[in-house]
Amino acid sequence: MKSEAKGRLPADPSPWGAQVQAVGRRYDHEFGGQPFDLPPEVEEMAVFQDWIAGSLTPRISTPFWESVKPRKRDRCLDIGCGISFLIYPWREWEALFQGHEISPVACAALTARGPQLNSKLFKGVTQGPAHRLEYEPQSFDMAIATGVSCYYPPDYWATVLQQVKKVLKPGGWFLFDAINPEAELAEPWAILETYLGAEVHLEDLSRWPALVKAEGARVVSTKDYELFRLFKVKWDV
């Protein structure tokens, strides 16, 4: 797989282009260590204090491997990967990592440090949105997308599912999470993310299995965490 780390995300002519750009800028700011200019009432929120302290991200990050742990030599596509290769136990799993990310800053960090960490497992990172997976058909044993669907409407995720199906090997797993709008943290976190520059969509959790079914797949199981529900999805061969 090729590695791309461009300086700027190109304009996206799709209906979701503006939101894609907004999410990219929001994470460029964070990964680049740039300060956010937020109103005092937001900075006084407990969720903001936890975020600044570094305790929020570990709480809300979905441990997808509790549902399907990557196997040795599995080819795994991590959509919206951030810097996951640098912080998750990919070396322990001995799985092959291909990243897909819209933040140029995150892509640059992975491109610089991934090969140093493990050049055999790190297969590169492509800068691009989740609805454009330009890989060879049936390339991956598993695809992962955590912390991504919450920023987009359901019709966007239908397109992502179509793209994932093309690049998964027959019988491969797709693991994605969706925000639980009933979670205590959901509304405060959505407010914080909006002020950080990326609007969050609080969709009813019942919409996701129906969406998956409409794209010819099925939800095999789910697992709830503090903020997100993880969906374990498969297309039957």
Regions found by a protein language model. Give the residues of each.
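Class I (Rossmann-like) S-adenosyl-L-methionine-dependent methyltransferase catalytic domain
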Residues: 1-73, 82-132, 152-157, 173-237
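A conserved beta-strand element that flanks and buttresses the S-adenosyl-L-methionine
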Residues: 144
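Conserved beta-strand/loop positions that form the S-adenosyl-L-methionine
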Residues: 79
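Conserved acidic residues
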Residues: 74, 141
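Short catalytic micro-motifs in class I SAM-dependent methyltransferases
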Residues: 147-148
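A short glycine-rich, Lys/Arg-flanked "PGG" loop and its adjoining helix->strand segment in the class I
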Residues: 158-170
